[in-house]
Amino acid sequence: MNNGILHQNYNSKKFDIIKISLASPEVIRSWSHGEVKKPETINYRTFKPERDGLFCAKIFGPIKDYECLCGKYKRLKHRGVVCERCGVEVEQAKVRRERMGHIDLVCPVVHIWYLKSLPSRIGLFLDMPLKNVEKVLYFESYIVTDPGMTPLEKKQLLTDEEYAEALENYGYEFEASMGAEAIRDLLADTDIESEIELLQAECEESKSTAKKEKAIKRLRLLETFQASGNKPEWMVMTVLPVLPPDLRPLVPIEGGRFATSDLNDLYRRVINRNNRLKKLLDLNAPDIIVRNEKRMLQEAVDALLDNGRRGRAVTGSNKRPLKSLADMIKGKQGRFRQNLLGKRVDYSGRSVITVGPSLRLHECGLPKKMALELFKPFVYSKLRLGGHATTIKQAKRMVELEEAVVWDILETVINEHPVLLNRAPTLHRLGIQAFEPRLIEGKAIQLHPLVCAAFNADFDGDQMAVHVPLTVESQLEARVLMMSTNNILSPASGQPIITPTQDIVLGLYYITREKEGARGEGKLFSSYEDVSRAYNSGTIDIHAKIKLRIDRQVFDTKGNTYNEKGVVNTTVGRALLLNILPEGLSFSLLNKVLVKKEISKIINQAFRVLGGKATVVLADKLMYAGFKYSTLSGVSVGVDDMTIPDNKEAKIEEAEKEIKQITEQYQSSLITENERYNNIINIWSKTSDEVGASMMDAISKDTVSINGEKKEIESFNSVYMMAKSGARGSYNQMRQLAGMRGLMAKPDGTMIETAITANFREGLSVLQYFTSTHGARKGLADTALKTANAGYLTRRLVDVAQDLVVIEEDCGTDDGLMFSAIVEDGEVKVPLVERALGRTLAADVVTEKGVVLLEAGTLLDENLVELLDDNGIDMIKVRSPITCKTRRGLCAKCYGRDLARERQVNVGESVGVIAAQSIGEPGTQLTMRTFHTGGAASLGITVSDIKVKTAGKIKFKNIRTVTNKEGQEIVISRAGEIIVSDTMGRVREQHKIPMGAVVPLASGKAVEIGDVIATWDPHAQPLITDVAGKVVLEDVIDGITSKHTYDDLTGQQTIEITSISQRTTSKNLKPVVKIVDEKGAELKSIPLAVGAVLNVADDSILEVGDIVAKIPLEGSKNKDITGGLPRVAELFEARRPKDAAILSPCDGMVRLGNRDTKEKQRIEIIDKNGHIVEEILLPKSRHLVVFDGEQVSRGDVLADGPTDPHDLLKYKGLEEFADYILIEAQSVYRMQGVVINDKHIETIVRQMLRKAVILDEGDSKFVKDESIELVRILEENDKLRKQGKKEVEYELVLMGITRSSLSTESFLSAASFQETTRVLTEASINSQIDNLRGLKENVLIGRLIPAGTGLAVRKESAKIEKMREELGVEDNMVFTDLSSFNPEEISFDSIQSQKEDKDINEDIEESLRNALESLDF
């Protein structure tokens, strides 16, 4: 057990945290093994390194193992001797990878990261602008370091002339200098403590926010220096470390030249300039020359540390910028992403894949050649153990000669040794799966067809990589966790992912179809065997309708068993499939035409009822059957399969006639350009649909004569069968093949108004072909961009969620989210049953009668969600990752079911990464399009009423109505909804009702299907009065704020309000309609928005419910809706939209029109006592949706616009915000038909809410308005609560995924994500500590990740560590028995309490055994 999992990384030093901080000159010298004095590298004749040069063996160690440079000492026995001739220590050559050197710089040099990485730390520390610091550094001006008694100020800049003048005036009473020395002196002189006190005072007193912010920034920086133990002068270097030579190698290439790492060039420049400066100083050279040399030294060091950060990058001989130290670690090719987060591994190979239709689901075909190479070590050892070879050398020889015995041994070695197959890009965890290899001839890997969907593989030349798990533990994990048979369900949605596609579907569809009058119709068979015999002998046709006697046992999901007996009507093909159907599934699943959806249902049902193993067997059998019968069917595609409908020409002529009329109307100015375009588009899409429909009619029916009479039957047309079964192709593609191609889009998404009337069978004309290239090219360009964008989104998601792991069973919260069905456009898109499946209840579910149906804490499975449905429950509270109280992780209860395993999630599951993959993986399927509404492409018919689709009752929500003079109820509220619930009280429909709609029915009335519950004018939004009175128009001045328009056609005259930008003068006028009573007292004032058309004149009398003005909706409709991938990215990045909706920050009454400025309008919100609580300034062009004097609640919309998620969270709370993100993100995916479980989106949202802003610091050390990790605040509050002090008050802050990733607690994780330089600069100044909690940090340092099996091992290791501490045992001491335990050396008290005779080793082994058991295989 000694070399088991617990002893991984045996020789790596044990460490728990990594700290990064500034290095002092002493520290750099302590790393170093000697000073590099010369720029020489190696002697080009002897190829030996020059002494004191960049590759010096004396400093860095010998070139050959255990051999000094001059050759005096060779062999291991001299180890550790220092040769007196050449000064080289006899050691292993690999010390050249770890020994560092140093360069003593003649003058100090500023580290460019702390100067140029924004915000400039040196500039901020000294409170100087970066420009000034640079002037001093690069010797352009002097800086006063000590003014003495002179009137000069400290840190004042002086030009050469001013300096000379000052010297003349004050002599040597003051000190001023230039260069890094000056900066270093200033940094060292700063008294941090007194500066902090001054700044704190300034923060409290300062009135201006800008000053305050700057002071706070400086204060933070100074405090970090104070706390971290870093000295500010260390940002200026006096000693430069030199990288070990093997990390910047110099390799000879043919032709006597050398290829070298760029770093050597950069170091050479530094050494050259340093040495030259030393000489110049020794010679007492003129100041100007020394100054120039110092500047060049500074520039050389800058280039070495971060080339190109300042000025032009230093280039090599080939005009390419040299790669500096900073470039080595950042970017995709840098150390982090190239070598640490992903490495190339041994025991792997890659090859092209081909299809393996005869494999079983857990197998893959591995070419013999490849297998032999991959399993070589295993084969060698087997050859020796079997006595075929005595030495490894002999075994090697046998393998090279490929003797017969080698192949036999390879077979035994491979037996039950799983291999991993991986297809790039690996977008989700199903991109790597384990298979048992089967040896095959040839050179291509064979892949099982059913796993293609998971790998997204096809056989058009795709390649896959094979990896061999070596250790027993890794083989165990591959078999138990990664075997393809254990990955039947997709972790994103919980639906089967091994469902048959394409040929298989076609074959199954073909044999389950029925044909009228086929041979053997109407016969009765007693069993499957009979049918099979009859079919094989050719007496019955495969499509014949027959009767079959069955007698089966069927299980349902609840575990009940019942018998299925009797004679059923079926067809021969379906009866033949009966053999495949496992015991326990009903024959009714097969007794229908099997299209793709139905086959998916069978697999799903099998998994629910019979479990994984039976499902795998069933899937395999279905696949074999599907392939067999699709081959036998002979379905193929010919030109004649595409039937062109007879009435196509007539329909097109008709359309052209209509278009002619419309063009004439346009030419005689009866309709606008926009209307003309929309009408033409409408006509073409209608025609195109009609032609398509008649084509489908023609292709889907066949006329056959049965016994002399003609009968219409479903067609056996190949193209039709492929599309119908879901094997390949779609209605849309068929329409283009045989109907008409229809309208084509331009790259911006609008439609080209000339439709393509031809189809592919007839062929396109040149013009038609040209029209269609436009959109097609856009499609190809989009696809290329989309892949990159989707990959980047996935990377950001993974990075933000990587450290989220389930770490405990239950956090004990009763918080959660309210879930109900998702309703869009009045239709239930996702029923509650689907959303609730696999979630844990946060509160009891109570029926209408008050009976507790399900208790809180119940995990809802399929049977329980049905129970919810049966009892008509339409809203439940479920626990969610967003509200989980576990710190630095999640609890299993809040997450609920592991979708791929169908039971509660295991502790240790890395749910964050799974969530990120589930959201990112379908990214490539999402469009890049922004949708234009308004164009006919998505116009449809404008909705102007609501008809009910369910019988039941209606209920009003937030609706206020008034009755007008015709006795109609008019809606005067804005965000009203009508809810339709069925007889059981379940919500079936939800409709938003616009202002001004007429509602014929009262709340609570019963409705039947098809009843109209609301009507409105679709073209204009009316402004309605709820009081009666006389009209007074204010600020409605013709020619200034309004204009008369005269309609030629109807002869009507209207008054329309003009926009502010069109007015030349009087910009502060606000057109208003006031309604007054007889005495002239104002009852109501209605502000008029831009574009409003007045319905009333001055002094006219209004009744309740009358329309004052209408706002035409034409203009507002043509906004682009961002859709697809950009929308998902926008949501997760939490971007603030342009012109977002303004929400009310508090409850109160709205007061408008007070103290408006020239460009802005002011909204005031006043409380009950008339005090102003909040003020909001808005541009006058923004249209308000509230009236003067209206009561609003916190979070109500004051001005229309897209939702800003930040405001939503702030004013409406966590739940509303979570709901918004869930529904918005899901609607994008739903449009593409992608199913993603809500919990994945919630998991990411949790990571976006990691920070909180402090409202009241209480008795803590935090600063008000500071934003800090939520975990830190909660931990601080725990401490304060224990001590009985005042706790911190905070509110959650939303951060986009990129910002959230960069502001994690772990600097390693952030640095390996983006902006490496900035992250490392900040971390080192803070002396930041990385606790190595996340997955990424552990991958970086090469440890088991703290998730899955790694978490269990980690917990056990922690236990053992604790035991060892209690026993006072050294790390590396393992006792074989207690007798060797020397009580004199170790304090014996602690062990007395332990079982004295128990062997410690046994304890360790036992805890390891527990660890493996707790993995719950």
Curated annotation (Swiss-Prot):
CDD domains: RNAP_beta'_C, RNAP_beta'_N. The keyword Protein transport does not apply. Binds 1 Mg(2+) ion per subunit. Mg(2+) binds at D458, D460, D462. The RNAP catalytic core consists of 2 alpha, 1 beta, 1 beta' and 1 omega subunit. When a sigma factor is associated with the core the holoenzyme is formed, which can initiate transcription. Belongs to the RNA polymerase beta' chain family. This is DNA-directed RNA polymerase subunit beta'. The gene is rpoC.
